[in-house]
């Protein structure tokens, strides 16, 4: 407790003596702790009863009650000191003056008689001398815990009383007033020992600060008294150190709230024992044995106990005064009980309010304690007017010392009537209760600061507030900018979405337009190809007819029978082929699209794919065998048209692929968006589906697989034919006896029938392919037809050429057409005839079955054809004749082809112009 007290010395100098009045002021002590300190001091002083300096509690209330200028009696010798007294004391507030005037009315003559003190001149000088000696060496440590004043010392020097009966009187409190009444009889004995009392009082009053008596003069000092005083001072210092230690221990006990009521009971019991021992105690015993027990207890901010130094002889006091004081004491005890209850309730309320938390204005007022708040001003003034310790006060309040000069005016009034005390105490107590509730016992850390430091702190606080405002403004600005950026970004995203939607719509429109254009182009191309096919068909029919007519003429010139050829001129071969081609054209252009649910992209894609594949196959076939009947210029034109078709198909395929990739990319993009919504990505290579093993042969394209299958079947057929031909039974049959040959017409008919029978599977295969590929173009059909007809013509030409060479040297039998069949087998060799020229009569005896078999073998194997394999030819002359006939035939065909080209080209140009003009 002592470490938290900050002591400030406030010197007040007087003009005459120059002595310093020292007083301590506790500045940073909360009122609650100060109250605890007073309790502890009273407890220790009552319990131990140690000798210490006299404790007084001078307050402004004493001044208010007892200042009475009518009762002031001062000797002429001390009159010069009054100006200094007036100078040293502080000015009294108007409220205090008003209360003083109010208190004057209640002071009676009885009270003035009880408050009178008589001193002789010698005793007064002796007291002044001892007081002045004690004031010189007083220290701040002695006054640290016990603040002193002499507010109740009143001097009066009258000429009526004798000089040996001058006594200083102690004005006692109501609690000890009965002690004075009962000690009147014992005061006569103290006259002989007054000098001893003076010495004791001088020793005990060493701690008293400079007051009004320091200006009344100085006398010679006694050395023995000084030495005694020094010894007493040392002793008192030791006692004070021990007292401080005890107070610290007591403060630790007071910090425990559960022990408060026990200590209060102990103090109250001790006070009661003190009141009971009033009959056995004299004033000398009180002064000598227990000076620390003479304390001031205030209730309702009015003195209940006042002690004074008693150096007086008997003064006659009335007996009724003691009964009145006993009644007052009883009332005071009741008030004290009420105060205990009120204080208990107040502490409970304070605990409740402190548990709720401190208010903001109290906190701000705590940190700005030196600023002039009206609440704090009223709080300080109320404290200075009313100090309310609970039971026993060890040291006076801080604010009482600031107005200590108010006590220096001596009064003769002793007490105020109890009714007036209660009347004055109630509003004051209410005010004190309000102030105690308002103050929250906060420790003020800025109480000792300079105003400059407080201003500096204010400036720092203002700067900090400005800095905080700037930071909040920056944060708000950043938030606003972020919000604007977010809005701008949303707008841009919406614009981008709208732009993408517009682009998507434009692309969709463009795609539809491209599809429409593609359909129109395809329709135009189909019309063109149909017209071209019709013109080619008509030209080919005309060429075939002319060729057959020329052949018939040539055969007729050579002497052959051409009746069968004339009959068949418009017969099976050309009519059948042209009819079948017409049916194929009708099937390709048949309105199947109109009779089923259509998907345009799929149909067009299939058409273009089939067309491209068929185009490649047709091109390969044309390269393998180009017919000499179609002119070269027409072939070039056909290749150009085919190349244009292939390029268009490729472009369409690319467009289809692009659109498919776009769709796939859109699907992937949406899939990515869906994946973004999923919090977890799928694991890789987990639970993969098992794939079926696919052999390499099945990985080829469909068209290539078909070609491979066809090649395989063809190879198997060739192998079977070879095995059958090399069979030994077949060879022995050929070596058997030859029957009679039929007529030449029968052989020719049989031979033609065999050719037709052999060509039928080829046609059926081609038509089965056409049925599979319905979307095959008419141009391809034309190529296939022309290829087939060319192969038929070539073989017929070969046969006719052979027969012509055979019949030309021997024209004896012109009416018979005997086909020449080459064979390695020798029948009935004639030694005169050449080996390669068998006799005609031998041929008549040949078996027709063998002839048919040989013809089949001849047409099956191209390897044994003498035109294709010249090494097999043994008769060079005959071969040369055959080749010569073929060259002549070729020259005639070429000439006919040129004539047809010159006739067909202007016709085709006119047809194309008419076709373009129609569109």
From Swiss-Prot:
Coiled coil location: 467-558
GO CC aspect terms: axoneme; centriolar satellite; centrosome; ciliary basal body; cilium; microtubule; midbody; photoreceptor inner segment
Stretches with biased composition (Polar residues): 150-161
Cellular location(s): Cytoplasm, Cytoskeleton, Microtubule organizing center, Centrosome; Cytoplasm, Cytoskeleton, Microtubule organizing center, Centrosome, Centriolar satellite; Cell projection, Cilium; Cytoplasm, Cytoskeleton, Cilium basal body
GO biological process, one term: mitotic spindle organization
Main location: cytoplasm
Region Disordered, annotated ranges: 145-166, 456-505, 724-744, 762-816
UniProtKB keywords: Cell cycle, Cell division, Cell projection, Cilium, Cilium biogenesis/degradation, Coiled coil, Cytoplasm, Cytoskeleton, Disulfide bond, Microtubule
One Pfam family here: CCDC66
Tissue: Expressed in retina and blood. Expressed in retina, mainly in photoreceptors but also in outer plexiform and ganglion cell layers (at protein level).
GO terms, molecular function: microtubule binding; protein homodimerization activity
Region (Mediates localization to cilia, centrosomes and spindle microtubules and the interaction with PCM1, CEP290, CEP104 and CSPP1): 570-919
Alphabetized InterPro entries for the sequence: CCD66, CCDC66_dom
PANTHER family with a match to the protein in the record: COILED-COIL DOMAIN-CONTAINING PROTEIN 66 (PTHR22736:SF2)
Task of the protein: Microtubule-binding protein required for ciliogenesis. May function in ciliogenesis by mediating the transport of proteins like BBS4 to the cilium, but also through the organization of the centriolar satellites. Required for the assembly of signaling-competent cilia with proper structure and length. Mediates this function in part by regulating transition zone assembly and basal body recruitment of the IFT-B complex. Cooperates with the ciliopathy proteins CSPP1 and CEP104 during cilium length regulation. Plays two important roles during cell division.
Subunit structure: Homodimer; disulfide-linked. Interacts with CEP290. Interacts with PCM1. Interacts with ARMC9, TOGARAM1, CSPP1 and CEP104. Interacts with CDK5RAP2, CEP152, CEP192, TBG1 and PRC1.
Disease linkage: Defects in CCDC66 are the cause of generalized progressive retinal atrophy (gPRA), characterized by continuous degeneration of photoreceptor cells leading to night blindness and progressive vision loss. A homozygous mutation in the CCDC66 gene resulting in a frameshift and the production of a truncated protein is probably causing the disease.
Protein name: Coiled-coil domain-containing protein 66
